Amino acid sequence: MKVAIVGAGLIGHTIAHMLRETGDYEVVAFDRDQHALDKLAAQGIPTQRVDSADAAALRAAVQGFDALVNALPYYLAVNVASAAKGAGVHYFDLTEDVRATSAIREIAESADHAFMPQCGLAPGFIGIAAHELANRFTEIRDVKMRVGALPEFPTNALKYNLTWSVDGLINEYCQPCEAIRDSRTQWVQPLEGLEHFSLDGTEYEAFNTSGGLGTLCETLAGRVESLDYKSVRYPGHRNLMQFLLEDLRLATDRDTLKNIMRRSVPSTAQDVVLVFITVSGMRDGQLVQEVFTRKIFARTVCSVPMSAIQITTAGAMCAVLDLFREKKLPQSGFVRQEQVSLRDFLANRFGQLYEGQSLDAVATV
């Protein structure tokens, strides 16, 4: 399968490396940043410089590929999806942006190839797992989806380090959040709904953030009383972000906030990804609660040290692409994450990264 990876940043680099290591994919990376491309070229991965904001140039560049994987920031998603449609290639992305996903859904109408956005951790894997749990109940009361990408060793006041896109992080803190309450789909405010819980002896907080549940509200509408998604952080983080975004009004000056965070909040590869899902409802005439949890830590994959967010985000994208290649997913139109079987995902060679396995055994290149 010939795959164009558009975006050679951290996650795009990881996706390209993982796919190449299987020996089943012919991968070419595209970006406008020559320095980022040079890093991939040094690993023997073919690259091509192209301006991803130029839809015509991108469309011409990806002609003849089977699939396009978009690993660029959310605000470029619609442009790249349009290029994929023009080139007649299948489209996959990682976007958490609700408006971008809605636009991509319109692009996918009447398309004879597949458009599958939101293929990362959240949205992505979290929706696959939550949908599987929900389907085990005859009557669903509550679905609670909690995900955190956290530093393993928090040391600053925010108790946070940068582990993924600053643009995506700020966007999910600022945009309205979809939820179901009292069996009705509605929009709730980001940073609200603060709650606290503990897992394995560690205290956490969680609060509303945008985009993490993908299309699950629509899929479960009419079947569930309450459904929501919240980001997990260490206690105290939400209050400080609320001060920055609301009291200092940086929600309306995102460029300044991005500069502050990039200058002052260090990145880390020593991170942990927490997935925590609870579903309650009726089964066999009894009120039952079922919990799904995973903790994924940074480790070496394909002989390369990788952070937990690299493993989970790139691993999810590669697993979904692999299942699509095996024709276990629809081959045309708009494809939702919850159309992926959790069993198939976790049995997949890339999905097994969520179970602590490695790809080293299948590397052939």
Regions found by a protein language model. Name each.
Residues 51-64:
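Conserved Rossmann-fold cofactor-binding substructure of NAD(P)-dependent oxidoreductases
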Residues 12-13:
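N-terminal Rossmann-fold NAD(P) dinucleotide-binding loop
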Residues 67-84, 97-101:
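Beta-loop-alpha module in the N-terminal Rossmann-like domain of NAD(P)-dependent dehydrogenases
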Residues 3-7:
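Conserved N-terminal Rossmann-fold NAD(P)-binding element of oxidoreductases
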Residues 136-365:
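C-terminal catalytic/substrate-binding lobe primarily of soluble NAD(P)-dependent oxidoreductases
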Residues 33-36, 98:
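Helix N-cap at the beta1-alpha1 junction of Rossmann-like dinucleotide-binding domains, i.e.
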Residues 62, 66-70, 91-93:
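N-terminal Rossmann-like NAD(P) cofactor-binding module of classical short-chain dehydrogenase/reductase
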Residues 94-117:
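Rossmann-fold NAD(P)-binding glycine/threonine-rich loop
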